[in-house]
Amino acid sequence: QELFEELQSENFHVVAVAIDENTETVSELAAGTSYPVLMDKDHLLTELYAISNVPSVIWIDENNMIARPAASEVGTDTFTEITGMSRETHMQQVRDWVRKGVLPDDASYSVPDLSEEEVQARLHFRIAAHLRREGREEEAGAHFDRAAELAPLDFTIVRASMPLRGGDPFGEEFFELYQKY
């Protein structure tokens, strides 16, 4: 929010996309933002941009071209003690890009295509989410399990399934996943 407010007069825009099914929780987290926050309950963005971790950012320029591909970045220092990641480096990179047209070195990174296992994992996740919405919890569980087997370190699958299965995406289960990552 702070960076958006700082740079919006320089034609800088933020669009947040929550890769989540819980609109109530996302709405609470989005309270007070003045930029759009969209919901992607079907994880389409993760497939389009090969996103496997959250939070991730994609920089898109005024010509609708990707200036920097998906990168794991944070917008707050809430979890700095856990992740060791500070927001300030990323924030300064954004300022330099907006004001000077300078891109960070990793902007030329080519995001590899999803592997066959990752594609299959995402399909299983989608099936599981659909089955869960239909009230078919047991069948959904089998597909969530298979998705996690195929892509065990994909946060957009493993962590995203936690609240859908009654787990806490910020609890012990998450920290176990984070340690593996």
Question: Which residues does each predicted region cover?
Answer:
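Structural microenvironment flanking redox-active thiols in thiol-disulfide oxidoreductases
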Residues: 1-31
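Short, internal strand/loop/helix patches
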Residues: 27-54, 58-60
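Thiol-/selenol-based redox modules, centered on thioredoxin-like
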Residues: 61-136
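Short coil turns that delineate tetratricopeptide repeat
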Residues: 118, 150-152
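Alpha-helical linker/edge segments of TPR/alpha-solenoid repeat scaffolds
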Residues: 164-181
